[in-house]
Every structure is written in structure tokens, then in C-alpha cells.
Amino acid sequence: MVQSCSAYGCKNRYDKDKPVSFHKFPLTRPSLCKKWEAAVRRKNFKPTKYSSICSEHFTPDCFKRECNNKLLKEDAVPTIFLCTEPHDKKEDLLEPQEQPPPPPLTPPISQVDAAIGLLMPPLQTPDNLSVFCDHNYTVEDTMHQRKRIHQLEQQVEKLRKKLKTAQQRCRRQERQLEKLKEVVHFQKEKDGASERGYVILPNDYFEIVEVPA
């Protein structure tokens, strides 16, 4: 009797030229045999001493390496099945289930409250108000400080210009003073031994210096 695979849809038969091995159901080990029967998933299938499963339905770790993958391990169970036997259509027919009642037109109060909570802004509690006010004060203070800093920078720039002008005037006054000293010295030498001498200075030797406030 030619060995063939008992798996549903599998057409493998023993052929010495094909690298496919066949393994009989472990009838002497009922617990393991039931696992094989459950894995096959064939209705009303009872294996006999001639029933077998081909090696294509076992994963590589189910075989013993020392036996060139020809013998199964003691606890090996077939798990690869591409086809399964279709179920009886009568069993697939399910009893009509009761239809759930239609949803009410008016949503529950809890849903209405939740929707209102999403649409309405949160109530301004004292804590929220204080945080909001503090935030506004912080923004206003920052803007005021920036404006004040800008004003101070402008004032500093003006004072720098005034200081530069005053320094220039001071240098001019120093030069005029040096000229005045030279004139006085010259006049003294000219008068010689006279007890009192008079010096007539030109008008351009004097300049009114305005000190910035």
C-alpha cells in the first residue's frame, strides 16, 4: 500500500525520488496522537495504523539532526497546514441575534455635559485669574522695561554728544589760555621795568562756555 499524506488537501505520496518522508500517527501515545488529530483539523477523522503525515507539515526543529532530518523528535507535532477541511454550512449558520435597540435621539445627560464642557471655556477660578493677571503683568512689565531701556539709551547718546562738544570747547579754551599767557609774557618783556602795564586783548580771545545741565 502506497503511503499518502492524511492532511486535508495534501496530495503527497511516497516517491523515492522526492525528499519527502512520511510519519505515522503515534497511536501508542494517545495524548500525543490527539494533538496530531487536532492539528489535522479533519471532521470525524480517526487515524489508523496506515495513516501518516508527510514531512512538509513539520517545522525543521521537529526533526533529529543526527538522523539527517528523517526521524521526528518524541514530542513533535505537525503545525504547517495550508488547507483545512471546510465546515458544514449548517453549522456555519448562526442563530439570528437580537438587534440592539436604536440609540436614543436625545443624548444622555452625561454626554451633553461633556459636550458643553468642550464648547465652553473653563471657569475662571481665583487661582486661574491670579495666574492670568500675573501673566499680563509680566508681559506689560517687560514691554515697559524695554521702552524705558530704549529711552535711557537715547539719553546716554545725547549726553555723549554733549560731553564731546564740551571737551572740544575745553580744548579750545586751553589753547586760548596758552595764547593769552604768551601775550602777557610778551607784554611784560616789552614794558620792561614799568610798575604797571596794560594789555589790550582782542575780542576773539574770550568765549562763553555753556555747561550742559
Swiss-Prot record:
A motif (HCFC1-binding motif (HBM)) lies at residues 134-137. SUPFAM superfamilies: Glucocorticoid receptor-like (DNA-binding domain) (SSF57716). It is found in: Nucleus, Nucleoplasm; Nucleus, PML body. It holds the Pfam family THAP. GO terms for biological process: DNA-templated transcription; endothelial cell proliferation; regulation of DNA-templated transcription; regulation of mitotic cell cycle; regulation of transcription by RNA polymerase II. GO terms for molecular function: DNA-binding transcription factor activity; protein homodimerization activity; RNA polymerase II cis-regulatory region sequence-specific DNA binding; sequence-specific DNA binding; zinc ion binding. Interacts with PAWR. Component of a THAP1/THAP3-HCFC1-OGT complex that contains, either THAP1 or THAP3, HCFC1 and OGT. Interacts with OGT. Interacts (via the HBM) with HCFC1 (via the Kelch-repeat domain); the interaction recruits HCFC1 to the RRM1 promoter. DNA-binding transcription regulator that regulates endothelial cell proliferation and G1/S cell-cycle progression. Specifically binds the 5'-[AT]NTNN[GT]GGCA[AGT]-3' core DNA sequence and acts by modulating expression of pRB-E2F cell-cycle target genes, including RRM1. May also have pro-apoptotic activity by potentiating both serum-withdrawal and TNF-induced apoptosis. This is THAP domain-containing protein 1.
